[in-house]
């Protein structure tokens, strides 16, 4: 009936409903609930074929590794670059700027996006600064060693033959600066996990 259908929809539309619903009795999770949910969701199968893509690895050295190309990361890289330090600026996005690209406020009398573009242009003109877009810092280890994964071919529909799809860089940095930004704090209220309910930052961005 419509009433029952609506009630069922309210339950099953909720994000992660199965983690909140199938909690009792505890012994049922492994033997009953989980197998049913896994079968309903479907599991992928390995093809068994060789990976056709090419992957590479390399080494880089710098005085300062800046992780994140938002307003803080751009400012830090620019300051260090102007001072003559060897700088590497990595960001997982294809375009530097971070939240500046989505916010309405400006910086220094210009829009955030224009300010970011101006800073990037100056960084590109400095021979001692290297920009690494589409790159993710995935690990930090002893002695200033950082692992950075650069996606060099994922965004290209038909990459050149022999060009690596990804490069794993071992970056030796005297200092590193984490400028990964912040996550908007979630405000808890009833049914806040239903589809269509977004935080203010997501509304401004999308």
Q: Which residues are covered by each model-predicted region?
A:
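Non-catalytic propeptide/linker segments at domain boundaries
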Residues: 13-51
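Single conserved hydrophobic/aromatic residue that forms the stacking wall/gate
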Residues: 1-12
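N-terminal Rossmann-like FAD-binding beta1-loop-alpha1 element of flavoenzymes
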Residues: 63-88
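Glycine-rich FAD pyrophosphate-binding loop
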Residues: 83-101
């Amino acid at each position: 009936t419509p009433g029952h259908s609506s009630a069922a929809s309210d339950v099953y539309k909720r994000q992660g409903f199965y983690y909140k619903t199938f909690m009792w009795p505890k012994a049922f999770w492994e033997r009953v609930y989980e197998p049913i949910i896994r079968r309903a969701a479907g599991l992928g199968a390995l093809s068994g074929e060789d990976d056709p893509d090419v992957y590479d690895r390399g080494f880089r050295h710098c005085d300062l590794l800046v992780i994140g190309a938002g307003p803080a990361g751009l400012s830090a890289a620019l300051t260090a670059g102007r001072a003559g330090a060897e700088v590497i600026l990595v960001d997982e996005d294809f375009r530097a700027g971070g939240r500046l690209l989505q916010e309405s406020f400006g910086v220094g009398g210009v829009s955030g996006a224009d300010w970011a573009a101006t800073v990037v242009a100056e960084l590109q003109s400095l021979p001692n600064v290297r920009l690494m877009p589409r790159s993710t810092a995935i690990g930090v280890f002893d002695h200033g060693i950082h692992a950075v994964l650069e996606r060099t071919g994922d965004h290209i529909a038909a990459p050149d033959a022999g060009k690596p799809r990804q490069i794993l860089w071992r970056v030796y940095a005297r200092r590193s600066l984490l400028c990964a930004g912040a996550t908007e704090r979630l405000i808890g209220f009833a049914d806040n996990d239903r589809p269509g309910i977004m935080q203010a930052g997501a509304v401004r961005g999308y």
